[in-house]
UniProtKB/Swiss-Prot annotation:
Protein name (database record): NADH-quinone oxidoreductase subunit I
Reaction(s) catalysed by this chain's protein: a quinone + NADH + 5 H(+)(in) = a quinol + NAD(+) + 4 H(+)(out)
Compartment(s): Cell inner membrane
PROSITE patterns per UniProt: 4FE4S_FER_1 (PS00198), 4FE4S_FER_2 (PS51379)
Top-rank lineage group of the source organism: Bacteria
GO biological process assignments: aerobic respiration
């Protein structure tokens, strides 16, 4: 009697499996055939890292090194230089994408909105050393996500022709000795 009961349970299990497979055969497929059907990631997808320019066409990066410090895997390296008008810029800016985990910490740490993550995800390569991108590979011609932001309008740093407090939307420096009781 126990063997007969086990046979019916096994047959029922087999029929239920066939029924479930049959139902899935006619349902919509979740798998996309990637190269033929393009994948469109969400707008907040963190992909390829780019360096942007401000509205006047100059690069936004001031080589403050905050992105390199914030990076948990240490894949960003740069060196600061200073131009004749007093602006800082990176002499070199290098990201090793073979180590990058695309966490977005560098984008959050950047005070100038120079470093931004785009939804581009097709970055594979055959050689590891080809995944080390230099500044020329990362620098794009546009402002990226933040169209009107210009760090030097808000920073309070002296630039060649403007003193502190003379830039757009910047108040004059406060003399602390004048406000003492």
């Amino acid at each position: 009697m126990m063997k007969l009961k086990k046979v019916f349970i096994d047959i029922g299990s087999i029929l239920r499996s066939i029924w479930m497979i049959g139902m899935q055969a006619f349902s919509k497929r979740e798998t996309r055939m990637y190269p033929e059907v393009p994948y469109i990631p969400s707008p907040r997808y963190r992909g390829r890292i780019v360096l942007t320019r401000d509205s006047s066409g100059r690069e936004r990066c001031v080589a403050c090194n905050l992105c390199a410090v914030a990076c948990p895997v240490g894949c960003i390296s740069l060196k600061k230089g200073e131009s004749t008008d007093g602006r800082w810029y990176p002499k070199f800016f290098r990201i090793n994408f073979s180590r990058c985990i695309f966490c977005g910490m560098c984008e959050e740490a950047c005070p100038t909105a120079a470093i931004q993550l785009t939804p581009d995800f097709e970055m594979s390569d055959f050689k590891r050393h080809d995944l080390v991108y230099e500044k020329s590979d990362l620098l794009i011609s546009g402002p990226g996500k933040y169209l009107e932001y210009d760090f030097y309008q808000f920073s309070g740093k002296e630039i060649l022709d403007k003193k502190k407090g003379d830039a757009i939307k910047e108040s004059k420096p406060i003399n602390v000795k004048n406000i003492l009781p």
